[in-house]
Design a protein with these regions (language model features):
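A membrane-interface helix-boundary motif in multi-pass transporters
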Residues: 121-148
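Cytoplasmic membrane-interface "Motif A"-like loop-to-helix N-cap segments
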Residues: 33-44
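Helix-to-loop junctions at the C-terminal end of transmembrane segments
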Residues: 23-35, 121
């Protein structure tokens, strides 16, 4: 809103959410045919491509398309990876594994994310005032950092793919 100057970003957000949700339903059928493990890599790559496109997006239409790609990849990868966690959870250990999952999927990102985001955003010379507080305007560098961190998630997926091929 502040960086790109879109007055009505709600329309953009609505388009992105509706289109990516529809695409997820359609692509869910592909995931069902190919399997979750084989679909995990392309889903994460799709999300990463969307993030790098968001880094370069400056117009409403390019931002919308990039957002749809990023969000579709995010929704599919979240669905696929969450179901894989359930698939690989040993019987009787569901509570323990879900607790560990919550630590890595919720707690650590909630602690580390604001620090990383703040580090990237502080380099911005643009500011805005919200409720009397001057804040730095988030810049596209947030998406570049997200892209790089998303690539790290491919490392365990490589091992999962190897394991799947061996069995």
């Amino acid at each position: 809103q502040n960086y790109l100057g879109f007055d009505n970003y709600v329309v953009l957000l609505g388009i992105v959410l509706v289109l990516s949700s529809v695409l997820c339903v359609v692509l869910g059928k592909v995931v069902d045919k190919r399997g979750r493990v084989r679909s995990s890599f392309p889903a994460v790559i799709l999300m990463a491509i969307g993030m790098i496109l968001m880094f370069f997006a400056r117009s409403f239409i390019v931002t919308t398309i990039s957002g749809v790609i990023m969000m579709t990849g995010y929704l599919i990868s979240t669905s696929v990876l969450s179901s894989l966690v359930r698939d690989y959870t040993p019987k009787g250990k569901e509570g323990e594994i879900q607790g560990v999952r919550m630590i890595f999927q919720v707690m650590i990102p909630m602690i580390v994310g604001p620090f990383l985001g703040s580090f990237v955003i502080k380099g911005s010379s643009l500011t805005y005032t919200e409720l009397g507080v001057v804040k730095s305007v988030p810049t596209p560098r947030v998406f570049l950092l997200s892209f790089l961190l998303t690539l790290l998630s491919l490392i365990p997926l490589v091992f999962l793919h190897r394991r799947e091929r061996r069995s």
